[in-house]
Amino acid sequence: MRRLFVIGALAAGLVVVGSGEAHAQGYRTYMYVPGIPGSAVDENHKDWIEVLSMSQGVMGTKKSVACSDLSIMKYLDQAGPLLWVAAALGQVFPEIRIELVRPGLSNGVLYDIRINNAKVTSSQTSGSSELPAESVSFSYQSITLTYNIPDAKGALHPGVPQTISCQ
């Protein structure tokens, strides 16, 4: 029984250590929406929107492709009201860029997402005693995804862009 407890405690410790590793590496996500400045201060992403989390998806068959909205969570910032207006007016953005970066990697951009002919489909604000957050969703006609491959020395090697047309 004691041996089982020790094994369980070791496994739990590994899960805790493992789950903190990605966070400790300091990944950051930024989004560029033309004409809508954000509050990012990163030297390579000045005035971009800082993204807290993101979700995207695609479903396909041999005959059709359906892309789900790309949704982000962000803290309330100067971009918020402008994104609300873009949603209300049905404004189309030729290209929106999202970059997942990790400091210390040469060129820095690990994952590059570009959505084309994008529209804000919803924008919602929620909050508590801490800084309010906003959830913003985008529809788009096509998406290009590029995962740049890191090596053991921290250098990134160009990935192959993959483009999906969403109908």
Task: Report each predicted region and the residues it spans.
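Positively charged n-region of N-terminal signal peptides that target proteins for export
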Residues: 1-4
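Bacterial N-terminal signal peptides
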Residues: 7-17
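Glycine-rich, low-complexity intrinsically disordered segments
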Residues: 21-167
